[in-house]
Amino acid sequence: MSISYTGQLPTTSPLSLTQLITSDRYQQVIENADAARARVREQLKHAKKTGATEANGDIMPVIKALEEYMPHITSIVDNEGVFRFTSQIITCWRLPFQSQSSMANKTPLHGLSFEYIMVLFTYALALATLANQYVARDKEDRWKHASAYISKARGVVDYLRQCRSFQIICNEPPASVPRDLSSATMSALSHMLCGASHMLILYKCDAETYLDGGAPSAGANSGGFSSSLLLRTAIFARDQFETASALLGEPVSKRKLVTSLVKEKSSKFSLSKKLHLRKDDGSPSLAPVSSFESNRDLSSTSSGTLDSLLSWLSRARGVAEGFVFKHMAIQAYENNQIGKAVGAAYAAILQLEDVKIPQKSALYIPVTHLKETLNRHHADYKADNDRLSFEPVPSPSELAQEWPSGRQVISAQKWTPQTSLDLGEDTSSSAPKYSGQGSYY
């Protein structure tokens, strides 16, 4: 599991812009774009072959190639009036979310708008990949850099969603727009990145606590932030992942479990299966739903596409809810509500019990530390309650009804692409056009 989902980084087929576009005054812009795009293609191929997208990989060459190409393609897109399109542009890309196999076919996309959007899309995913690679590094500034790149990736996606090329695509018949490039998918990606940026705060606070001497004792908070703020931050992150899942069309029934044992009174919460299937003492009260059945449910949604992304969002929600209960427990302990602290810490442990992360994952150590912290907290709280307080321990479902509203603490970073050509033309008009606009005469 990574700090954000990136799927398979897109790859693309050759495309000669100089054979499709001409200009009396700005032919050099087209030639520069051609050369830069060729480097993008080579770097994407190289990244795929060498595992550059892995946590220990190096995605920076891909990012640099994309940053070299974007000013040229942006100049052409923003100043179509000074370029002549001699033939229809057909650009072929292997889509990142639907192409779960490295051998999946590339999808032909008609028009310069699709080329531009795929470049921006790929750039956002590459930035998110770089953020994940920073998380995997054992360096003090890793969280700062990871947060910066996640925020920038979200800024790129938000720019993509507002730009004229995307509006052109959105006005095309739905059948001609791949699911990866739909408005709902891009909106979901923005929400996912927003949630990921807030999760980084929670991971950073836990990491700083460990630097101060290991798993904190019962009364210790993380990173010097108030438990109230971290609680609401975790809820906000969790809600962002929930919104992303809803935008991708995952049915509510797939995100929530209502059993005869526990019936949720609020549609706001989606606790893990084990929270509902265990008693407060930890003993099972109903047969748990198997991971196979859970995966089968996910794989049957969204017409067989985007399943890996939905699965990632489900796990991300689970970890976020673990943080919610953790900081709920700390807040309760600070307020001398020892029984509530015991119940919340135990709910967090159950929430994270099924979260299995490979050792090579960037989040293996942070989540392992989180689990260790929760076990120690629960033991400390329970010892205090058994010896001194003797307070009743609320169930996870009762605690869930007490969640406050989430709080956004990181704003979106505004991003705009550079251009290599500025003619001062008015490009503010967003009148709908078809995606092949300017493709041929």
Curated annotation (Swiss-Prot):
One Gene Ontology BP term is: cellular response to pH
Provide the residue span(s) of the region labelled Disordered: 278-304, 414-441
**One GO CC term, this protein:** plasma membrane
Record-linked InterPro entries:
BRO1_dom, BRO1_sf, pH-resp_palC
Which SMART domains is this protein grouped with?
A: BRO1
Disulphide bridges, residue numbers: none
Q: Where is the BRO1 domain?
A: 3-352
Report the family membership: Belongs to the palC family.
Q: Which PANTHER family match?
A: PH-RESPONSE REGULATOR PROTEIN PALC
This chain's function reads: Required for the proteolytic cleavage of the transcription factor RIM101 in response to alkaline ambient pH.
The identity of this protein, by name, is pH-response regulator protein palC
Gene source species:
Yarrowia lipolytica (strain CLIB 122 / E 150) (Yeast)
